[in-house]
Amino acid sequence: MFLTQTFIYTLTPKFDILISGGGSYARAEYTNFFTNEYSSKNRIGFDSLWLGFIDTGDSIADLIPQITFQTAVVQREKAINQTKNFYLKSQSLQASLRGYSDPVVYSIYTGFGYNQSRKFKTLKIEYGNSIYVGGDLSIILSPKITLDLGAEQRFQMKQKINGYQNSEVRSIPTLSLGSTYSINSDTAVSVNASFGGSSASPDSIFGISLWKKF
């Protein structure tokens, strides 16, 4: 289970500061090979903190361009029995175009994710970079409710451990379906489910988001 908190602070009408932090809860279950005794272990911890910006350009033929950049200030990762913090090791850059045609709000986007290698005591892990392209569609059903649809195609580059390749380039298609309900002009809640289209992606991810304007 994951929990992510995102803050968007508007400096100017076309420039926003983006801050995002996340943590997770995981439960590991074990069965003793010799005694067949069951045991479990719970973990709650901080995972990452990202900092970036959103730059909105002037409209082009009724489409609004945006550039979003983020860098991982800190990421907490575990390999075998070592947990280590990594600083400024991952960055992402995304370009998008947003448009509106009653009753639909839509966007298309493409992006690139960059990962530097991670060095542990006995391991050097190179996760590989990623590129992706996708689109989102929100159908306005009423003044308070939208139906949200999305599709994305991502390619994850080869991964290496201690210089040895242990994965090929992976194609990761996903589809998403959800809905957003506006409680008032400052607050909205949304539910979302995404479904993977390959063995390299999770079968399904379900999420609930709360949006609040201060």
Residue ranges of each PLM-predicted region?
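Repeated loop/turn-to-beta-strand initiation elements of outer-membrane beta-barrel proteins
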Residues: K14-I19, D58-P65, P103-I108, P143-L149, ...
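Outer membrane beta-barrel transmembrane domains
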Residues: Y30-N32, Y127-Y132, D136-F214
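Transmembrane beta-barrel architecture of outer-membrane proteins
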Residues: M1-F2, I44-W50, L88-S92, S130-Y132, ...
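Outer-membrane pore/translocation modules
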Residues: G22-E126, E168
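Subset of outer-membrane beta-barrel
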Residues: M1-L49, L137-I140, T146, S194
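Residues on the lipid-exposed face of transmembrane beta-strands in outer-membrane beta-barrel proteins
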Residues: Q5-Y9, S48-D55, L93-G99, F112, ...
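Transmembrane beta-barrel strands of outer-membrane/channel proteins
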Residues: I19-G23, I67-Q75, I108-Y114, G135, ...
